[in-house]
Amino acid sequence: MSKIVDDGEGDTIFAIDRVSEEILIKFIDREIASHVPIVLIAEGLDGGKVVLPRGSSESEAVWRIIVDPIDGTRGLMYQKRSAWILTGIAPNLGDDTKLSDIEFAIQTEIPLVKQHLSDTVWAFRGQGAKAERFNRLTGEITSIDLRPSSSESIEQGFAMISRFFPGVRDVLAEIDEEIVRGALGSPISGKAQCFEDQYISTGGQLYELIAGHDRFVADIRPLLAKAMSERGLDLSICCHPYDLCTELIARELSVIVTDENGLPLSSRLSNETDVAWVGYANRSIRDQIEPHLQSSIRKRGMLRD
């Protein structure tokens, strides 16, 4: 399942991804497209999207459904962390349909083999969010209450800049250090001011914010293009709209999700767009962290137009 089967645009496609995409198309075609025409957007599809049922035109579609069949493939392949099935549904506004147009989102945990519990979280715009936990040993499903952290500081909490892959991890670490130093001051002898968790799954990171496990997460990899170019390197894999198609859930639970400029996410629903995003558990955390984050990336000339 860890064999690479496609390394084109978007993320690397592993064998496990290919299997999930085939199942996805059949499921959407049978359960949804048999009732209403839709545009399915997912990595691995020819051209990045397909209109279902077959033979329908894109202009006829009522909905655009963007899916990441397995977000967190690498951690799941090696049985390190759960992965997630991410789905966002927006009215079909053509190619200009954006993340901000998504009306319904759902993410479902794909547990490790040794793990018997898995969560599903979903939200309709303006109606809050709900969550359930499934016990695959007993078949029992129970409602769970997920709440973001109410802490007013990142001190003694999980807070991090994502730096999953090589290239400019040193730059990202410098930014991380500047933010923490600005927010918490100099390290104290024998103490850990805050901690990090490099969860290679955007859906997983959003879940950690939703569940109150993380207080601050920023994935600003797209802003590193210049720094990598100066080193003679190409920009490596970044976050894409399908990775963020469930951010509606986080917002419905009062998690603050922005782009690098502090604005709501507004990327078009596509497979190629590189997206930078920042998540804060609450307003106090944003007030504590955002000025230092903005200062750090601005002084490096990293902000995009």
Predicted features along the sequence, with ranges:
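N-terminal subdomain of lithium-sensitive/metallo-dependent phosphomonoesterases centered on the IMPase/IPPase/PAP
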Residues: 1-70, 256, 283-285, 290-305
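A short glycine/serine-rich beta->alpha loop
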Residues: 7-13, 71-75, 194-196, 234-237
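Short, conserved micro-motifs enriched in small and acidic residues
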Residues: 11-19, 77-80, 200-203, 237-244
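Buried hydrophobic packing segments
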Residues: 24, 28, 85, 89, ...
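Hydrophobic alpha-helical membrane context
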Residues: 29, 80-83, 217
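Alpha-helix termini
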Residues: 29-37, 91-97, 112-113, 182-190
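An extended, acidic
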Residues: 56-57, 100-102, 108-305
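DPxDG-like acidic metal-binding loop motif
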Residues: 58-126
